[in-house]
């Protein structure tokens, strides 16, 4: 069965979203057209507003509606700690976990020479400028534990060599609640290499 040209156009447009295939796009479109046209109008309005007004923080490069995001504007954050992440989603995950009170720098990707993505494409020139300010004492590399993420972390580490800025990497290992028999070999090996002294609670 073929829908009208406008419906077909809507289906095709919905498929630009990650993880949305033909069937999912059809369910979304038909739901909005049949059952929730008001919701569809709100979606269009919100998306239009976001596309029009959301840009990038001039300091950390995360998504923001103002020149500086709320985190960069927060005087309570520790300017000496700078966490480098690949995406705004990674930054949000760290914020939601709580515990980190430093600032961020968002790469919006990782180095990938085969895809033509070099240092300037992920803002490493801007990271150099940020570090040249002198307020950063430690850089925490929180790139993903993938081949590209590791390559990016090593590149940044080379950039920092001789600058006097401390460098650390997020620890990776066995997840809380996980069982060793289900942990892959690479993760288990990294957990052993990054093991810490056992802190016993005083009775």
Curated annotation (Swiss-Prot):
One of its GO terms (molecular function) is DNA binding. The keyword Glycoprotein does not apply. It comes from the Bacteria. Gene3D superfamilies: 3.40.1360.10, 6.10.250.240, RecR Domain 1. Residues 80-175 form the Toprim domain. One of its GO terms (biological process) is DNA recombination. Pfam families: RecR_C, RecR_HhH, RecR_ZnF, Toprim_4. A zinc finger (C4-type) spans 57-72. Keywords: DNA damage, DNA recombination, DNA repair, Metal-binding, Zinc, Zinc-finger. Disulfide bonds: none annotated. The keyword Zinc applies. HAMAP family: RecR. May play a role in DNA repair. It seems to be involved in an RecBC-independent recombinational process of DNA repair. It may act with RecF and RecO. Belongs to the RecR family. This is Recombination protein RecR. The gene is recR.
